[in-house]
């Protein structure tokens, strides 16, 4: 292959780029995961030797950290059929990994894919800001109105606009680093991200932004030196100061962000009404964990199991949606209630070993690896940890990180 040909993305590389960008589209990523799982099952049947691949074994170990506790939880599940379906979906990502790890992108495409995803995230930010300013986004979607926010941004990403941006933010940070070693790209992208998050009004996503920034700054500081970390942190602090000014100047936005204090005792008074039911969900999750300390109430069975408790608390009628879909709105408590102590142990093993792997992984694997950590973050409260959307983002990101690391390591050895 000529040098000019090697500098172009192959068809497989474009599919990789599309797969990662689909993380923002929810059901698209979930459907693609099922297709990849079917293909992975075929490849595993035809090429059983793939099981000796160290990257694939690592993926299956991480899956096992939650899949084994999920299997144990089924025996006491109050919704056995749903628990079984959730477990099967979780295990299907092991077959997805067969495809992604056995068919990775080309080594010359890794940086381009990262930059391409970063550009897509920048577009998503602009689309949401555009929607907030004129009332509809580029393709005509109007602002969403509900009991929590009368003017919620959805853009291309749906109701969880800010959450998607925060989970994918490591791709934006790494893409900026790759495209401009002097750090100027950070000064464009990071303020744009902060504006999108503020306008999105998602307090939980604001916490994810803090964790994403701290994690990325720490990793590049350890791997590339203090100078690289400072190049990243300075525009972050500048954007943070700018955000404070914006919130101070806009009472509507400022009041909404201050309302996050309402989840704590003695918080924001009347402004806490929107969030006043969350502490009861947390109490219910703890109570269910104490009642079923070993293997929990069953994966994805929290809602039905907690319905009587929350009715006794007098808040069941204030929680949106049917009890079937309720979650503790805190990932670590979801694991505790659904999977018990066995699940908490597996969850801790998954997170600690993933962090250790990331510290030593090739730099090109940092973006997908951190994305997985953001999706699995213990204090995540926007979407249920075991929901289809979070599972797809988390496990496909882990498989992508392993595939990127495999390609980068092989290239370094040659």
Regions found by a protein language model. Give the residues of each.
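Membrane-embedded alpha-helical segments of multi-pass membrane proteins
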Residues: 27-46, 87-97, 160-169, 207-214, ...
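Juxtamembrane membrane-water interface segments that cap and precede transmembrane helices
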Residues: 13-18, 141-156, 276, 318-333
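Loop-to-helix entry and N-terminal half of a specific, functionally important transmembrane alpha helix
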Residues: 11-19, 189, 326-330, 348-350, ...
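A membrane-periplasm/extracellular boundary helix in multi-pass inner-membrane enzymes
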Residues: 126, 130, 199, 220-269, ...
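Transmembrane signal-anchor hairpin modules in multi-pass inner-membrane enzymes, especially those
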Residues: 1-85, 95-115, 119, 176-184, ...
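Transmembrane alpha-helices of multi-pass inner-membrane enzymes
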Residues: 36-42, 209, 213-214, 241, ...
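Alpha-helical transmembrane segments of multi-pass inner-membrane proteins
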Residues: 20, 95, 111-142, 148, ...
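Long extracytoplasmic/lumenal interhelical loops at the membrane interface
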Residues: 268-283, 291, 295-339
């Amino acid at each position: 292959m000529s040098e000019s040909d090697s500098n172009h993305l192959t068809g497989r590389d474009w599919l990789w780029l599309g797969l990662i960008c689909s993380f923002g589209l929810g059901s698209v990523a979930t459907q693609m995961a099922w297709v990849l799982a079917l293909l992975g099952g075929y490849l595993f049947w035809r090429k059983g030797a793939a099981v000796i691949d160290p990257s694939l074994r690592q993926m299956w170990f991480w899956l096992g950290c939650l899949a084994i506790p999920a299997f144990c939880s089924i025996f006491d599940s109050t919704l056995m059929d749903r628990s079984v379906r959730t477990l099967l979906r979780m295990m299907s990502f092991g077959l997805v990994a067969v495809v992604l790890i056995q068919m990775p992108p080309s080594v010359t495409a890794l940086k381009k894919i990262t930059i391409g995803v970063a550009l897509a995230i920048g577009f998503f930010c602009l689309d949401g800001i555009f929607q907030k300013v004129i009332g509809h986004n580029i393709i005509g979607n109007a602002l969403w109105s509900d009991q929590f926010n009368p003017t919620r941004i959805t853009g291309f990403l749906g109701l969880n606009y800010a959450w998607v941006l925060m989970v994918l933010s490591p791709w934006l940070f790494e893409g900026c680093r790759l495209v401009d070693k002097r750090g100027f790209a950070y000064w464009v992208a990071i303020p744009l991200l902060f504006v999108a998050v503020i306008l999105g009004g998602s307090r939980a996503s604001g916490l994810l932004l803090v964790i994403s920034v701290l994690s990325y700054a720490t990793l590049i500081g350890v791997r590339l030196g203090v100078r690289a970390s400072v190049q990243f942190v300075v525009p972050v602090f500048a954007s943070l100061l700018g955000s404070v000014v914006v919130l101070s100047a806009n009472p509507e936005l400022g009041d909404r962000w201050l309302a996050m204090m309402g989840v704590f005792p003695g918080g924001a008074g009347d402004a806490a009404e929107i969030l006043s039911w969350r502490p009861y969900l947390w109490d219910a999750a703890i109570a269910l964990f104490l009642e079923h300390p070993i293997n929990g109430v069953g994966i994805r069975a929290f809602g039905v199991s907690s319905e009587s408790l929350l009715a006794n608390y007098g808040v069941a009628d204030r929680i949106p949606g049917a009890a079937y879909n309720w979650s503790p709105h805190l990932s670590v408590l979801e694991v505790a209630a659904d999977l018990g102590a066995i699940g908490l142990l597996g969850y801790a093993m998954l997170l600690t070993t993933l962090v250790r792997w990331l510290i030593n992984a090739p730099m090109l694997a940092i973006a997908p690896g951190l994305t997985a950590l953001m999706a699995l973050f213990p204090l995540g409260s926007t979407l249920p940890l075991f929901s289809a959307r979070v599972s797809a983002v988390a496990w496909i990101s882990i498989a992508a990180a392993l595939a990127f690391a495999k390609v980068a390591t092989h290239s370094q050895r040659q």
